[in-house]
Amino acid sequence: MKKILLIILLSIIMINAQTPTAKSILEKIDENMVSENQVVVSKMVIHGRRRSRTIKSKSWSVGDSKNFTEYLSPAREQGTKMLKIDDNLWIYTPSTDRIIKISGHMLKQSVMGSDLSYEDMMESGELTDSYDAKVVGSGEIDERDCWIINLNGKVSDLAYQKRKIWVDKTKYVPLREELYAKSGKLLKRMDLENIVKIDGRWYPTKMIFKDMLKSG
């Protein structure tokens, strides 16, 4: 009986030793996903009911507080610019030659007709600064072993107070995120794909964003 009990205790100790803490996982995610300065050329494909369209842009970021984005194509969006400084966001549209500050309820509006809102774009910074985390299980995304982690906001100014993330156990990059309302209702889901190494960091080069409240 003592031998069996000893084996069980040793097994529990080994399992605990192999599973890092939720906080240490978040710290490694932040190391991969957050950089001091970056330049990103991106392509956003928006799938509508009747047609799809592609929007190209280029962004410059300084830390998590400053970001400037210029839309390059198509012609209708070309020259549109967005400037984010801390919690402030401004948009310039060449068709009206006006600068508009996006605030309040306007932050929930769609960006270029996509499922991404301005509020989503304002989300930045390190997860460890904004959320308390708990490992709730393991799973698989595209045959990659993942930790499943629940995040609960520890600051008030978050677009999503509750999140669930599936984190690659080898590369420490989220492969899926579910974003929830305070009530627990699922609002949006993001799948992160094509993970590549850039300057020693693992980073997703494709993100699929879906509003779960929309049908189809």
Describe every region a protein language model picked out.
Residues 94-122:
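Acidic/charged, solvent-exposed loop-and-adjacent secondary-structure segments enriched in E/D, K/R, S/T
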Residues 45, 62-64, 72-74, 87-88, ...:
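Solvent-exposed coil/turn segments that connect beta secondary-structure elements
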Residues 98, 102, 122-124, 144-216:
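Gly/Pro-enriched, hydrophobic low-complexity segments
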Residues 4-13:
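Sec-dependent N-terminal signal peptides
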Residues 20-95:
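N-terminal mature ectodomain segment of secretory-pathway/periplasmic proteins
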Residues 12-20:
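Bacterial Sec-dependent signal peptides at the C-terminal "C-region" and cleavage site
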Residues 114-152:
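Short, conserved active-site entrance elements at the starts or edges of catalytic domains
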